[in-house]
């Protein structure tokens, strides 16, 4: 999963995104079936929504009710639990900072952490905006509480996350999940089938 791998599938997501959670269940296996790896890139949709004038899908009248039904249906299709945490939506700032702290040490460990965070949010319905929950997950994976506390308050990691969001905006990422495959953008969990076909054909 080397960040420098030119043919890697890039996976942008917000930890607060239900569709990001669903995509996280499938994207690694999908990419691996085509000999590709995945670069996981957590971002924050809040600053992006300020740019686009959007808001969380579940907060949109009429559309939000359908989206909740669709998320539950998609979760049943791939056989994973889904529970909407409260409060929702939530800010995943701490969870994202810890991801990049881990990423710079061990990319595989960062991805393993991301999957646990998603499960805590959307299977256990826990509030991952709380530093205590983020710390607990990292502790469970073998990291010391003092390391986690330091990382959460590290100004360099704060800037790192801001920079990742700015890069995403520059690349015209506007939602979660969002993918780049050979430079081609794909938005949404419902584009995984298109990504699969794109990788089979080599594009079209």
Predicted regions and their residues:
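C-terminal cap of thioredoxin/glutaredoxin-like
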Residues: 4-10, 16-36, 112, 116-204
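Structural alpha/beta surface segment adjacent to cysteine/selenocysteine redox centers
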Residues: 15, 19-121
